[in-house]
């Protein structure tokens, strides 16, 4: 998961609001996942979610749609209304040869999603 407009937010509003967007993104992602799923900030404006016990692609798509919706509402911070969005790349562990390969597949899908449309997800296949 990678922000679509984080640099623009930092440039327009400053780093304190950018930091708040990162915190709010983490909170919203965690609130949009199940208790046994793992949400982590990898670096900068990039996050990862490890979903356990997902057996159907349709369920995965439903989860991704919920994640997209979680940031539909803007962040209200002091006197600022900040719209933010992200793109999601999806990869399946059983289709990867290693954890690094899994992340590379998810990154590949995420960057494809970024080129197609902001606020979108792509499944690596």
Regions inferred by a protein language model and the residue ranges of each:
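Short alpha-helical N-box/ATP-lid segment at the N-terminus of the HATPase_c
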Residues: 68
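Flexible, nucleotide-binding loop/lid elements of kinase catalytic cores
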Residues: 13, 82, 89-91, 118-121
């Amino acid at each position: 998961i990678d922000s679509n407009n984080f640099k623009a937010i930092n440039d327009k509003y400053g780093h304190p609001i950018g930091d708040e967007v990162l915190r709010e993104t983490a909170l919203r992602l965690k609130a949009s996942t199940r208790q046994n799923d793992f949400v982590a900030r990898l670096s900068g404006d990039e996050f990862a979610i490890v979903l356990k016990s997902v057996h159907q692609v349709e369920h995965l798509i439903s989860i991704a749609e919920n994640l997209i919706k979680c940031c539909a509402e803007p962040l209200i911070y002091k006197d600022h209304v900040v719209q933010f969005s992200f793109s999601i790349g999806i990869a399946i562990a059983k289709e990867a040869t290693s954890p690094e390969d899994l992340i590379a597949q998810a990154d590949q899908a995420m960057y494809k999603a970024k080129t197609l449309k902001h606020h979108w997800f792509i499944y690596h296949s």
